[in-house]
């Protein structure tokens, strides 16, 4: 299988995956798995959520567990290169007909939400 050619001049620059929010049925069991089995650290708990980070994570969290009835990966967050890239991403998603919304999220800076097609 050939390796696809890189996109050298993307419409905006993504540095890395930032965080994942998982919807889980049993918050205590999920906490035990991520903390006791995988060795992640709890950075905060409350209101049906647990924020976790790995040893080398520089931010507040890389995983958020949220209690709910439908287990799923609810959110994938990406770290962009800089603030202008966040504006470029908003413009690009809107031009592609995808929803865009500026949202407030605990422990995150300026945050843009969209949805994949």
Segments from the language model and where they lie:
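Intrinsic, low-complexity N-terminal interaction/targeting segments
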Residues: 60-64, 102-105
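Short, flexible, solvent-exposed loop/turn segments with mixed acidic/basic and small polar residues
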Residues: 10-11, 64-68
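Short acidic/glycine-enriched loop/turn segments that link adjacent beta-strands
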Residues: 47-49, 72, 106-110
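Core segments of cupin and vicinal oxygen chelate
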Residues: 12-59
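Vicinal oxygen chelate
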Residues: 1-10, 16-25, 66-117
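A broad, low-specificity signal marking well-ordered, structured residues that form hydrophobic/aromatic
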Residues: 50, 63, 112
């Amino acid at each position: 299988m050939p390796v696809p050619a890189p996109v050298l001049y993307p419409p905006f620059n993504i540095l890395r995956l930032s965080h994942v929010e998982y919807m889980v049925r049993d918050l205590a069991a999920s906490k035990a798995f991520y903390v006791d089995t995988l060795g992640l650290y709890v950075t905060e708990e409350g209101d049906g959520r647990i924020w976790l980070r790995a040893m080398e994570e520089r931010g507040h969290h890389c995983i958020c567990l949220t209690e709910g009835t439908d287990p799923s990966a609810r959110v994938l967050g990406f770290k962009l290169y800089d603030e202008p890239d966040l504006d470029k991403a908003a413009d690009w998603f809107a031009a592609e007909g995808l929803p865009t919304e500026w949202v407030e999220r605990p422990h995150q800076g300026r945050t843009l939400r969209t949805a994949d097609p």
